[in-house]
């Protein structure tokens, strides 16, 4: 399911995005963010992170560096160290 969700993002990045002027105010771009978020966090959480990121992408937001949050580690593995 995750790989299927990444197909439209890949299509946009390689077929549509090069035809448009660069508009993204964030680094990485929103499409790169969406791809990485879904790939790392899965369809549900990655989709939610992407939805929130797209909500921040507007003219009144200064943009800047906004990476995908790291995958949370479980407390039991961090306590064992």
Swiss-Prot record:
Give the record's keywords alphabetically. Cell inner membrane, Cell membrane, Membrane
One GO term of the cellular component aspect? plasma membrane
Q: Where does the record place it?
A: Cell inner membrane
Q: Report which superkingdom the organism of origin falls in.
A: Bacteria
Membrane topology summary? Peripheral membrane protein
One Pfam family this chain carries? YidD
Claim: Cell membrane is one of the keywords in the record: yes
Q: Where is this region: Disordered?
A: 61-81
NCBIfam families the record matches: membrane protein insertion efficiency factor YidD
Database matches in HAMAP family: UPF0161_YidD
Similarity field: Belongs to the UPF0161 family.
In UniProt terms, what function does this protein have?
A: Could be involved in insertion of integral membrane proteins into the membrane.
The protein, known as: Putative membrane protein insertion efficiency factor
In its UniProt entry, the species of origin is given as Pseudomonas fluorescens (strain Pf0-1)
